[in-house]
């Protein structure tokens, strides 16, 4: 299977990458079938050979996740929702909903406690007034 992946080159700690088409079993920095572009993560510079990339995708080449993101930014692929993103967002939404319910419950309990305390104070003041009028 042909993969579209990034091939690292450049100095230590100053990596740049070439977008290459290669066999999925070959090494990351091995000889590619074809060089399709360039990506520098420091400067965010990206150069893509759009015709060659479309040709490789038409032949069934599978891009890696990072390459897919670059191609989506370049307008060569439509943005797709990946299953892991869907699951993560669903978990986050469920957590937010549970937190909101918990906060609402705590607020209701605090309001009820405040109302009970106010009622107790009112009873205490009423009983104090009645004792003072009796005596």
UniProtKB/Swiss-Prot annotation:
Instruction: Write out the ranges of the annotated region (Disordered).
Output: 82-135
Q: List GO molecular-function terms, semicolon-separated.
A: structural constituent of ribosome
Q: Does the keyword Cell cycle apply?
A: no
Q: Which PROSITE patterns match?
A: RIBOSOMAL_S16 (PS00732)
Q: Where is the composition biased (Acidic residues)?
A: 123-135
Q: Name one GO cellular component term.
A: small ribosomal subunit
Read off the NCBIfam families from this record.
S16 (TIGR00002)
The name of this protein is: Small ribosomal subunit protein bS16
Give the species this sequence originates from: Synechococcus sp. (strain CC9605)
